[in-house]
Design a protein with these regions (language model features):
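Conserved beta-strand-loop-beta-strand hairpin that lines the nucleotide-binding pocket
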Residues: 1-16, 61-141
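Short coil/turn residues that cap or connect secondary-structure elements
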Residues: 21, 37, 41-44, 61, ...
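STAS-typified acidic loop motif
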Residues: 16-28
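Histidine-centered phosphotransfer motif of kinases
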Residues: 48-66
Length: 141
């Protein structure tokens, strides 16, 4: 696996890694998120960031037929951290209304993401999509 760190217009490097589309990749994705947040001195976002990337990886594994996914962590602004997962599916994620029992059995990934992020969205590409969530930094670094 190759991890890349690319400079961005905000002056903070972005981090990304291509991983197999498997449940086991969530552990590597969490380590990448912790590494990026530590580099930016944003340790307070580590728990939420790792929870977010775990849900994004789980959704890609469950809802796509992709062989590979790409985990992307960036700073679109001084105040935000964006964590995303890119896959080859063009199916857009939706928050579905369901009863509490259904949520206990699964299907809470997007509900959880909606609760812990400042905002989230999907960037659709010709060949797939990126689902991402943004976390708000308490203080600009």
């Amino acid at each position: 696996m190759i991890v890349s760190a690319q400079p961005r217009p905000t002056g903070h490097p972005g981090y990304s890694e291509t991983l197999p589309c498997l449940e086991e990749s969530a552990e590597v994705a969490r380590k990448l998120v912790r590494t990026a947040l530590a580099a930016w001195h944003l340790h307070e976002l580590a728990d939420t960031g790792t929870l977010l990337v775990s849900e994004l990886v789980a959704n890609a594994v469950k809802h796509t037929n992709s062989r590979l996914i790409r985990v992307v962590i960036s700073r679109p602004s001084e105040r935000n951290v964006r964590i995303g997962v890119v896959d080859k599916s063009r199916t857009m994620p939706e928050i579905t209304k369901s009863n509490g029992e259904e949520l206990l059995l699964g299907g809470r990934g997007l509900v959880l993401m909606d609760a812990v992020t400042e905002r989230w969205g999907t960037d659709l590409y010709r060949w797939g999509k990126q689902v991402w969530g943004e976390l708000r930094c308490e203080e600009a670094v």
